[in-house]
Structure formats: structure tokens, C-alpha cells
């Protein structure tokens, strides 16, 4: 378990890892008895970004379930290498935590797993909110060489991208934009 940290004034996370039927997941669940709002973060984020995305959720009325999607922070990429596997991982996380249903709030690259979760597990979803989400399908081009495939489809590649973003954000952003 990572140390609790305050992300914004009044918003803290206490991330921990749970083993699900689909693999390990880093998550944070706020206290309370209310309905659950599950947050699927975008690219370059994790459990921390997910929690900040849910800052507007009434903490007295709802519980916020934030997670790191596969390949981000404490969740290994092997826990969900496809959109469908990530959707099933969301269901497995609910199972492991003993939760029946959740509203899903997604942002950016967190959209496709959220959409797939709602399609594959409709009985587990009581609401779906998409904030500036990716809504198309982006597949690895057939022309992508082994280095590009290794960077975008392995834990080591994801760690290297993260390190590049930390060490040289100027180069990282130049490649994206």
C-alpha cells in the first residue's frame, strides 16, 4: 500500500492493491454507505487522477471508487491489455470489493473501457458519464515495428514512457503534439 496523500485541499487518497480474478488493481474507495461512483481515468493518470476527476461528487451521498487502469501506476498492464479485458477488470474489482453496482465516470482514454463495461456488464452499471472521452477505436497499425509494439503493449514500455514524461516532458509532448 502506498502512503496516503492529499491531492487537493480536502481530497486525499489511500491507495491499496487488491487481487481480482483478472489480476491486481490499485484502487482507493472513499468511506460511507452511499451508491458507488467508479472513476476510469485518462492517459498519463492513475488512481490519483481518477480521484481528482471525482472532486465534484458529493462525498456525503456517494462513495468514490478510483483505480489505476492497467499499465498505470500500481496496476500491471497484464491485468487488462484490451479494452474488453479492462471492462472485465472493472467487474472483477467490484466483485473483489463486494460491490454490486456503480455509476461510471470516465475521462479521455478511460472512455473505451467504461463503454465496454456498460455493454458487457449492464446489470452492474446504474449510470455512465463520459467527460471528453475517446469514442473511436485506435488499433496498433500493422506497420508498427517490434519496438513500437513493445513500448505500447508491455509494462516495461509503459514505465519507459512514464519516465520519459517525467525526465523530459518537452520531448514527450513534442512527440504527441
Task: Label the predicted regions.
Residues 128-168:
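Flexible "cap/lid" loop of the alpha/beta hydrolase fold
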Residues 85-103:
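Conserved acidic catalytic loop of the alpha/beta-hydrolase fold
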Residues 32-34, 95-101, 122:
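Active-site acidic short loop of glycosyltransferases
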Residues 3-29:
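N-terminal cap/lid segment of alpha/beta-hydrolase-fold proteins
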Residues 77-82:
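Short glycine-enriched, charge-decorated loop/helix-capping segments at active-site entrances
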Residues 100-144:
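Conserved hydrolase catalytic core segment
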Residues 23-76:
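Conserved HGGG/HGGXW glycine-rich cap/lid loop of the alpha/beta-hydrolase fold
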Residues 166-177:
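Conserved alpha/beta-hydrolase catalytic His-Asp/Glu region
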Amino acid at each position: 500500500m502506498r502512503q496516503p496523500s492529499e491531492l487537493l485541499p480536502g481530497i486525499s487518497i489511500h491507495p491499496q492493491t487488491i487481487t481480482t480474478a483478472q489480476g491486481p488493481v490499485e484502487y482507493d474507495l472513499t468511506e460511507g454507505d452511499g451508491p458507488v461512483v467508479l472513476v476510469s481515468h485518462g492517459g498519463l493518470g492513475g488512481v490519483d487522477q481518477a480521484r481528482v476527476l471525482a472532486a465534484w461528487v458529493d462525498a456525503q451521498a456517494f462513495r468514490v471508487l478510483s483505480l489505476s487502469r492497467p499499465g498505470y501506476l500500481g496496476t500491471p498492464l497484464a491485468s487488462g491489455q484490451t479494452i474488453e479485458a479492462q471492462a472485465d477488470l472493472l467487474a472483477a474489482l467490484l466483485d473483489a470489493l463486494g460491490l454490486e453496482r456503480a455509476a461510471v465516470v470516465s475521462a479521455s482514454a478511460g472512455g473505451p473501457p467504461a463503454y465496454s463495461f456498460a455493454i458487457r456488464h449492464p446489470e452492474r452499471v446504474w449510470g455512465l458519464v463520459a467527460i471528453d472521452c475517446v469514442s473511436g477505436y485506435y488499433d496498433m497499425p500493422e506497420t508498427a515495428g517490434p519496438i513500437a509494439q513493445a513500448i505500447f503493449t508491455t509494462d516495461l514500455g509503459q514505465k519507459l514512457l512514464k519516465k520519459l514524461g517525467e525526465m523530459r516532458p518537452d520531448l514527450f509532448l513534442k512527440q504527441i503534439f
